[in-house]
């Protein structure tokens, strides 16, 4: 599994949730088709008259998520930018997504503007396995942001975190250690630790 594989999952799902922020700072979400995926880039389009277009132009920050039939979720957060050579990109999008011709027949397609996300963070989360599995990737060589929890050297070795963990992903040791690929990020371990030895990663 890598970043391109995750983007390909979003393409296979196709109808995914895109979230942006409006002019009042409020979150807005809608279902948008992933039109193309290649070389670490995700492509989509929207019409110039839509609020979605205005929000992308004003801010560019977007969050994308979808889940397939295997209960595998992919989440992408990054900045979307509008592409030049609009007609060329829209023609290619329509060629690879022919159902779009029924929605925007003829030259009406050119009310659409193509966008690309080629930067940001990707999270893969598989609920279809036991234990669950998660992984993190980034686009454009950005550093991967760590999430979840870590057990520090303040651990007293009582084992309470391991016994309470719903995925049993905490191994005994000095200190105890969380298997990050199987962690739910629920925070139960941090709440039950009597030594306050468990902290959020990256803090």
Tell where the protein language model's regions lie, with residue ranges.
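Short active-site oxyanion
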Residues: 39-43
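Solvent-exposed segments in extracellular or luminal domains encompassing
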Residues: 180-183
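Short His-Asn-centered micro-motif
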Residues: 45-47, 67
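A short, Trp-centered hydrophobic/proline-enriched beta-strand micro-motif
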Residues: 8-23, 62-66
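Iron-sulfur cluster-binding cysteine motifs and their immediate structural context
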Residues: 160-177, 188-203
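Ferredoxin-type iron-sulfur electron-transfer modules and their immediate structural context
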Residues: 112-114, 123-164, 168
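A short, well-structured catalytic beta-strand-centered motif of the EAL phosphodiesterase domain
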Residues: 32-36
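Short, structured beta-strand-loop surface elements
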Residues: 52-121, 127
């Amino acid at each position: 599994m890598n970043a391109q594989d995750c983007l390909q999952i979003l393409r296979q799902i196709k109808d995914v949730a895109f979230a942006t922020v409006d002019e009042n700072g409020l979150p807005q979400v809608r279902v948008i088709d992933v039109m193309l995926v290649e070389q670490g880039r995700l492509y989509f389009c929207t019409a110039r008259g839509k609020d979605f277009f205005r929000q992308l132009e004003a801010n560019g920050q977007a969050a994308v998520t979808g889940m397939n039939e295997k209960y595998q979720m992919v989440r992408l957060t990054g900045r979307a930018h509008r592409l030049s050579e609009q007609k060329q990109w829209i023609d290619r999008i329509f060629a690879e997504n022919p159902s779009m011709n029924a929605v925007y027949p003829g030259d009406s397609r050119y009310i659409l503007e193509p966008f690309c996300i080629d930067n940001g963070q990707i999270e893969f989360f598989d609920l279809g396995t036991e234990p669950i599995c998660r992984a993190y990737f980034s686009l454009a060589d950005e550093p991967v942001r760590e999430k979840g929890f870590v057990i520090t050297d303040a651990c007293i070795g009582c084992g309470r975190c391991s016994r309470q963990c719903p995925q049993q992903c905490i191994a005994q040791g000095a200190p105890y250690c969380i298997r990050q690929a199987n962690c739910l990020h629920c925070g139960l371990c941090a709440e039950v630790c009597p030594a306050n030895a468990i902290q959020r990663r990256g803090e």
